[in-house]
Amino acid sequence: MHIHVVKRGDTLSSIAAMHDALPAFVAADNGLTLSTPLVIGQALVVRTPKTLHTVRVGETLSSIARDYDLSVRTLLRRNFFLHGRELLREGDVLAIDYADEAPLGTLGVNAYAYPYIGGELLDSVLPYLTYLTPFTYGITPAGVLAPLDDARLLERAARYGAKSLMHLSTLTPEGNFSSENAAALLQNDRAQSALLAEILQTMAKKGYYGLDVDFEYVPPELREDYAAFVCRLREALNAEGKPVVAALAPKTSAQQRGLLYEAHDYALLSKAANAVFLMTYE
């Protein structure tokens, strides 16, 4: 992989030729089109294909992947210009592998998605995701799940090999995280039991891989109650082979003040859950 800084007179074609790449690949990898004008000083990622395959009549993504002992998911990842589409055209040129790109390690990638996300955008990112998390299942104070139209997202995630996480939050239909709903649930053992039973039923019915717990604006005095609730979820779900992730607000210190932060005790929640997701976008 190269980082090319655009100079006067550079074009996508000349840059691609300089690095033994293809203009269409350079454009797609940098969020450009072949007609996008370049700007002097602009930095572009350029990847040099090691092996190329030109699509012939009758070939499919699956057959090509099989010929090179690759998964369809890997082939899609290596050809971002496809944007997740599986329909190939005769003459399409695919990168089978790239030069000088040894694996650096492993990385788990999760993305939240609203049920109304556009299909083209969803399909373009799914090959790169480890997990897809439809947003969100809210709760009532009595421990009843608010429904979520997640069927399309779950179907697409399964098609592209991404595991699905069920997202549990205190978000209300009005779009606000409810401190009141969180407090009512965390102080009501019967409501927690009802919610846990419904979560297990929903996950089994819809094929969810795990659970992401995202309670925000929890009253500070319920810090330990929240951690105990997450622990209770983990124990029940782990028994079914399902992990529990706790979403944490970003903090600069354990003493950080504010309703968003104080009940998110990093030490307690990291022990209560199987993993944590640090919401640095907050």
Each language-model region and where it sits:
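Short, conserved secondary-structure segments in the cores of folded domains
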Residues: H2, L34, T51, H83-G84
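Chitinase-like catalytic core of GlcNAc-active glycosidases
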Residues: A102-P115, L126, T140-E282
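Short, structured beta-strand/loop micro-motifs enriched in basic residues and often containing a Trp
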Residues: D20-N30, S71-N79
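Short, structured interface segments
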Residues: N30-P49, L87-D100
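Non-catalytic accessory regions flanking glycosidase/transglycosidase catalytic cores in CAZymes
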Residues: T60, S71-Y131, A197, A239
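Soluble periplasmic/extracytoplasmic beta-strand elements of cell-envelope proteins
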Residues: H4-K7, A43-V45, T54-R56, V93-A95, ...
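Primarily a LysM-type cell-wall glycan-binding module
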Residues: M1-D20, Q42-D69, D92
